[in-house]
Regions:
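Bacterial N-terminal signal peptides that target proteins for export
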Residues: 1-8
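C-terminal motif of bacterial Sec signal peptides marking the signal peptidase cleavage site
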Residues: 18-19
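Acidic/histidine-rich, surface-exposed loop or edge segments in extracytoplasmic proteins
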Residues: 35-61
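Second-shell loop/turn segments in exported
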Residues: 52-64, 125-138, 159-166, 195-200, ...
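Auxiliary, metal-adjacent structural segments of Zn-dependent hydrolase domains
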Residues: 54-120
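Zinc-dependent metallopeptidase catalytic helix centered on the HExxH motif
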Residues: 100, 107-187
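Short helix/loop segments within enzyme catalytic domains
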Residues: 181-198, 214-229
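Pan-zinc metallopeptidase signature
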Residues: 207-275
Length: 275
């Protein structure tokens, strides 16, 4: 019995090494999504008189192609291929420009989603120097984040968005990890875009850069597999998801991986853990 258990453990470890930690899986191509229809795009501009609206339209002359192109990038980052059975199919993306004090938000659900984007924020990004590249970078980045909310899986058995717990940190952490992976944040860990210290449970960029680092260092399909764990685990948690993707062992607990990440990017005085 002991010999059989040892054999099973050895086989499992070999499969884990082959498919997970630190190895390079075949990278699915973005072109595989060219024929996937991400949904009809309907643009509403509620503040056409604002400078922000005029700047946005100058940068985005073809809103449908712009939004659908970003949607395909998001889908490519979240899922292995259009044939994946858990890929959601949206019928409609309603995108609204509006002069308000926030930045952006996604609402709706199922196969109809709504995204609101602030023309006031566009003006702020444009600045006095008229930096259209900055506006485009920010507009794409925000759109990647909101479209992730439209297409991402939702974990089960771990609370709700409103309680600010593991469900919330997964939802917002994945959205910023996808934004980062698509180039919507600076991918250099020394960049000012990356928050220093903190904790993965803070979601957003804290979790986003952590997940991006794991994808770079624990297998280049880590992010897709971590995301898919939301569909595969009946009771989801960050710790359970890490073990689900990377295997058993204390070194694969979320706290151990967070410490390893913090050490690797220079946010901890401790030496990096080596496996």
């Amino acid at each position: 019995m002991k010999r059989l258990s040892l054999f099973a453990a050895t086989v499992w470890a070999a499969l884990t090494l082959a498919g997970c930690a630190g190895t390079k899986a075949p990278v699915p191509t973005l072109e595989a999504w060219n024929d996937f229809y991400p949904g009809d795009v309907h643009l509403t501009d509620r503040s056409p008189e604002t400078r922000g609206s005029q700047i946005w339209h100058a940068i985005v002359p073809n809103p449908e192609a712009y939004i659908q192109g970003c949607a395909r990038e998001v889908l490519h980052t979240l899922y292995t291929s259009p044939a994946d059975t858990v890929v959601p199919h949206l019928r409609e993306i309603r995108y609204r420009l509006e002069d308000y004090g926030g930045i952006s938000e996604k609402s709706g659900g199922g196969d109809h989603v709504r995204i609101r984007y602030s023309t006031r924020w566009v003006e702020r990004c444009f600045g006095n120097d008229g930096d259209t590249a900055r506006v485009d970078h920010e507009t794409r980045g925000v759109l990647y984040h909101e479209l992730t909310h439209a297409y991402q899986l939702e974990p089960k058995g771990c609370g709700s968005y409103g309680d600010g717990g593991e469900y919330w940190s997964f939802i917002e952490g994945m959205a910023d990890a996808v934004r980062l992976s698509c180039g919507g944040f600076e991918q250099d860990f020394a960049s000012s875009d990356r928050p220093r210290g903190g904790h993965w449970s803070k979601g957003y960029r804290h979790a986003g850069y952590f997940l991006y680092w794991l994808n770079q260092n624990k297998g280049n399909d880590f992010l897709r597999r971590f995301h898919r764990s939301a569909a595969e685990l009946p009771v989801w948690s960050w710790d359970a998801a890490m073990h689900h993707v990377l295997g058993p062992g204390e070194q694969h607990s979320v706290e151990a991986l967070w410490r390893e990440y913090q050490q690797a990017v220079g946010d901890s005085e401790e030496q990096p853990v080596t496996e």
